[in-house]
Structures are given as structure tokens and as C-alpha cells.
Amino acid sequence: MKLLVLCLFAMMATLAVSRHRFRFIPHKYIRKEFEVALKVEIIAGFDRTLVKWLRVHGGRLSTVQKKALYFVNRRYMQTHWQNYMLWIVRKTDALGRPPVVADYSRLGAEIGRRIDMAYFYNFLNGRNMIPKYLPYMEEINRMRPADVPVANRGK
């Protein structure tokens, strides 16, 4: 009963605080070739960070846990795709010309480089929270970075 009351108060507080500040992030859509350039560079940056992190901290991890961390890279990109799009739209609008694939590759590489995934890996590893490796993770890991699904319905 106490837990129910606590959850109810937490929900009410969340609604009260977020009522005026929370905004839905509208979806931004881009053409397929731009999406592919972004995904390839973002995942390449995340994977480079993971390789460096595994070189230092990966000795204690099993092969399955390492595969799960590669999945975490892809899922992180999928989860934050629309937030990336807000930043990307702002950057491409600032160009003053129509963007090309190289612009999206450069922005994707910047995202992959700037996001501190090593902190995230340390967090997961330190708290023993690396997810169990499941069949759907294997499916996504086997995909080329260009084929990883994201919430984009561009042409």
C-alpha cells in the first residue's frame, strides 16, 4: 500500500513539473541516403569508442557481454535518433545551402565522436547491468549499420 501511494505521488509530481516544460519532439524526416550516411558514421564512432574501452576494460568481460555492448551502441542510436535530428536540422539550416551526403556524414561522425559512450559502458559494467544477449540483439548486430532501423520515414 505504501508503495502504491509513493508511486501515485511520484506520478503526480512528474506531471506537475513537466506540465509546462515538456514538449513533444516533432519527428524530422530526411532522405534515405542522408539517413544511411548518418547511421554509418554514428555507429562507427560508437564502435571505435567501444573498441578503445574494451582494450582497457574488456579483459573481465565474456564474449557474450562484448556482443551485448555492441548492441547497446545500436540501440542507443535508435533511441536518441529524433534528438540527433533536431541538432542535425539546426546544423544543416546553418549551412546556407542545400545539404549533401558529405554534410550528413560529417555530422554523423561528430555525433559518434562527441557522445561519451565510455562513461555509459563504465556505468553498465560497474553496476553489472550489461543486458543478457537475446536473439533480437543478434539480429540487429548482424545488420549493416546502414540497415539498422530508426524512426525515419523519409523518401
UniProtKB/Swiss-Prot annotation:
Secretion signal, residue range per the UniProt entry: 1-18
Gene3D superfamilies noted in UniProt: Fertilization protein
Tissue expression as described in the entry: Sperm (at protein level).
SUPFAM superfamilies in UniProt: Fertilization protein
Keywords: Cytoplasmic vesicle, Fertilization, Signal
Compartment(s): Cytoplasmic vesicle, Secretory vesicle, Acrosome lumen
GO biological process assignments: single fertilization
UniProt key word Translocase: no
GO cellular component, one term: acrosomal lumen
Subunit structure: Monomer. Homodimer. Molecules associate into dimers and then rapidly dissociate again. Interacts (as a monomer) with the egg vitelline layer protein VERL (via VERL repeats); each VERL chain can bind multiple copies of lysin.
Functional description taken from the UniProt entry: Creates a 3 um hole in the egg vitelline layer through which the sperm passes. Does not have enzyme activity. Species-specific interaction between the sperm protein lysin and the egg protein VERL exposes a basic surface on lysin that may dissociate the egg vitelline layer via electrostatic repulsion. Plays a role in ensuring species-specific fertilization.
Protein name stated in the entry: Egg-lysin
High-level lineage: Eukaryota, Metazoa, Spiralia, Lophotrochozoa, Mollusca
